[in-house]
């Protein structure tokens, strides 16, 4: 129908996509500088970088697909697999905690709702692990 054919335009206008090598994200809501809600879409077989944030924590809610999450043991510096999180499961990432989001599926996109909160929610608050 005509109404449905242009619905993507409204969605794109309200929350434009920011493309990344792993997929894309949309900022859904920013009520103040200390809180931001994003939707991450990770393409099949793709992985975000191992990263941490100094000034914010994150809460991840898996909306669709299966997420695999890795972290770094700060005592041993070994990478640890926190396991898989299926749709409707959630995970808390503390500030300064190394974390990596992976979509191991070769056919289904992973959608995660990310709630960022802390002193600041700026995109440049990121340190990537070599």
Task: Go through each PLM region and give its residues.
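Short beta-strand His + acidic residue motifs that chelate non-heme Fe in jelly-roll/DSBH
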Residues: 49-51, 69-70, 92-93, 99-106, ...
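Classical nucleotidyltransferase
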Residues: 1-22
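Double-stranded beta-helix
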Residues: 100-130
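Short glycine/proline-enriched turns and hinge-like loops at secondary-structure junctions
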Residues: 52-54, 62, 85, 104-106
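A short glycine-rich, His/Asp/Glu-containing loop-to-beta-strand
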Residues: 18-57, 63, 115
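A compact, surface-exposed functional segment
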Residues: 58-59, 63-65, 71, 128
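Short acidic-glycine-tyrosine-enriched beta hairpin
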Residues: 71-99
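A generic "binding-loop/recognition-motif" signal
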Residues: 46, 55-56, 66, 97-98, ...
């Amino acid at each position: 129908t005509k109404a449905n054919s242009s619905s993507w335009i409204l969605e794109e206008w309200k929350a434009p996509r920011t493309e990344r090598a792993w997929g894309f994200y949309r900022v859904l809501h920013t009520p103040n500088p200390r809180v931001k809600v994003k939707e991450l879409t990770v393409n099949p077989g793709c992985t975000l970088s191992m990263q941490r944030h100094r000034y914010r924590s994150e809460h991840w809610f898996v909306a669709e697909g299966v997420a695999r999450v890795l972290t770094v043991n700060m005592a041993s510096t070994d990478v640890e697999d926190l396991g898989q999180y299926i749709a409707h499961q959630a995970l808390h990432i503390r500030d300064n905690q190394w974390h990596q989001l992976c979509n191991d599926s070769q056919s289904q996109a992973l959608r995660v709702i990310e709630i960022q909160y802390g002193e600041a929610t700026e995109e440049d608050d990121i340190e990537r692990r070599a």
